Amino acid sequence: NPDILCLQETKVSNNDFPLKAFEDLGYEVKFSGQKSYNGVAIISKLAIEDFKVDFLGELKENIVSKEYLKQKRIISAFINGVRIINVYVPNGSSLNSEKYEYKLKWLEYLSKYINKQKERNELTCILGDFNIAPTHLDIYDPKKYENGIMASVPEREALKKILKNEFIDAFRVFEKGSGFWSWWDYRKNSYELNRGWRIDLIYISKNLLPNLKSSVIANDERANEQPSDHAPIIINLNFDEKYEEYDSDDDDLFAI
């Protein structure tokens, strides 16, 4: 029962998004999708303001190649005083593929996007499926997978460039060690054997850190019948008296 729900890889066109199902539960919904591939959505009990779609939400058209606007992978909105940026980063396939080069260029555009957004000095939350394990601690078998796809030096350096020591991995505020995964391959009984990666991430701006109360991976959801191969990541933020217009069952807490 989150206050804000962010989805990635919705795989439906805008016309086919199950809008009514969420509206019947009291949510406002914004999304950007395409048939069979990609797609992102922000679903909120709180009012969604200043909704932006694609890289053109922050960047001028002459900066972004049209090739990087076709895939629906990024949206943002201003909700309850926080800028929510929801991303579905390309997987990259393999290090010698064109998809890998596409991924690195996409991350370069994301860096420019975040730099532009930061000019407004908003409380900010960047989240989604990053398809990058930030460190060796985020892979069940780093000796096997380090320097491969989702764990290569260029990918990690691109992620660091985006964050620039100005954003904090919310989960790592509470859990420092290894053994915490958000994604398990459908193949080879990966979930049953707990062979996972932590590639679904929530980053918060430093000015939002005092409001962060918890961050968990709901990995039990992966055990459901016909589950996603990803588990939900949840954070709770507390704004005390700051946003008195928001009235919820949890007082001043809201969950993403």
What are these regions (language model features)?
Residues 9-13, 17-94:
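Structured beta-strand-rich core segments of catalytic domains in phosphoester-bond hydrolases
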Residues 216-256:
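Surface polyanion/phosphate-binding segment centered on an Asp-His-Pro turn
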Residues 55-56, 169-178, 215-219:
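Acidic carboxylate-rich catalytic motifs and surrounding loops in phosphoryl-/glycosyl-chemistry enzymes
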Residues 36-51, 190-211, 237:
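Conserved beta strand-loop-helix elements of the APE1-like EEP
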Residues 14-16, 39-40, 93-96, 133-143, ...:
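Short catalytic/ligand-binding loop motif for oxyanion handling, primarily in non-cytosolic enzymes
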